[in-house]
């Protein structure tokens, strides 16, 4: 239930985001949502870092801590990080340029445990020469795991994982997804 102040802010057009945090093996997870869906999933070293990141991404929004209201979103993301079994499927409030949204929607269609390249993704969205722009859209992606840019690789693997969230946090996720697929296939055979 929205507070009276939140109802007034909505009428005035003030953007309201509720957020909560949780620990995971990759660091602190912050999920922020609006009335339209999840507006950000951020990963960082501590609560202060992810809150600063949220504030920098949404400087004109009314940010409200709401651990209880974000609990189900946090649980889905943390469960995915701890033991990936399927895609993170949350209703998103996609915020970005038209091009970024096009990239992010295409990234969401990359199958669990599979990867593609920036080059292939650029071709897929109909902009084969926009490889760098596709990479930039992945770099600024505020929807960690729900828009799985960790599955998009540079054609030279040594240059991959340039996401803001960092190589050490994102690199293991593709391997974890592929391991889950292998284990699932092994269980079916047995």
Give the residues covered by each predicted segment:
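Basic nucleic-acid-binding alpha-helical/helix-turn surface characteristic of O6-alkylguanine DNA
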Residues: 1-129, 176-190
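Short glycine/serine-rich loop segments
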Residues: 129-171
């Amino acid at each position: 239930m929205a507070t009276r102040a939140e109802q007034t802010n909505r009428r005035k057009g003030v953007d309201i985001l509720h957020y909560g945090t949780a620990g995971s093996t990759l660091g602190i997870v912050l999920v922020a949502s609006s009335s339209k869906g999840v507006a950000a999933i951020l990963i960082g070293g501590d609560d202060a870092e992810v809150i600063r990141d949220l504030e920098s991404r949404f400087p004109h929004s009314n940010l409200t801590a709401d651990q209880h209201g974000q609990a189900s979103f946090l649980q889905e993301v943390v469960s995915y990080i701890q033991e990936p079994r399927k895609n993170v499927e949350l209703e998103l409030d996609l915020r970005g340029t038209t091009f970024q949204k096009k990239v992010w929607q295409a990234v969401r269609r990359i199958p669990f445990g599979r990867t593609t390249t920036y080059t292939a993704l650029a071709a897929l969205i109909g902009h084969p020469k926009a490889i760098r722009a596709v990479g930039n859209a992945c770099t600024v992606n505020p929807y960690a795991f729900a828009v799985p840019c960790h599955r998009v690789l540079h054609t030279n693997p040594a240059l991959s994982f340039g996401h803001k969230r960092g190589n050490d946090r994102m690199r293991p996720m593709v391997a974890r997804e592929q391991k889950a697929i292998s284990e699932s296939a092994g269980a079916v055979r047995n």
